[in-house]
């Protein structure tokens, strides 16, 4: 057995023109790679220096899941995972395996994304949850694209996903924040608009053109890199707008079904765009409460949900 530098090996294999590649290694400490015309001799890594494969010890869960559905669920929520080094407990995707189904969750504290997938093959006796790092989750989604099912074996320390390839990862050991109550509260928002995700997405992108790259926050009175849009809901009239001194303002009408009292909320346009993009081509309901209440974005079949915290403006801070 030999070990080779992974990045260099990938670069070589992706660049060679031949359909077949011959790889050989002897006792010289070198590995020879050729496609018949181009030749490489690579220094091998001592096998004993290669990390030992991870395996779940005394696994608490072993079940099969539909690989494509799991990959899609991970992709939908991954954008919401925290990218801050000081929040390791949410720097990944939370997977909850339950009898008959599974759920993928990600949050960065300002938004929460949830994707569910039916999985009749799942034979978990009770819900079992663990969190995998974001990079691992991204790699896993790519690996599962060409698979039918994946065998998941997990303990609280290690999760292993096995199909034609096997991926093992350490799980994030830190406690994951409670999130189901956040969704429940947002689902009780009294004002709702319903429209195709693509229609809302187009209006948000258009309104955000005058949002600039900064807004002034009310609580700290400092600048942060946030592009804000305002969602204004009336009885028969829905608009998206933004305004900045350096760019001007925009008002974009949105054709949507309205149910509930008038409402107005300021949202991070990047978050809203990413949430609507994750909804794919589905019909979406956006539920709005007070200006300070998190907003619910949900596809009609409930398979994808995102909750987004609103932005408090300077005028709101002055009024409180």
Give the residues covered by each predicted segment.
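Structural preference for solvent-exposed beta-strand-turn elements
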Residues: 1-320
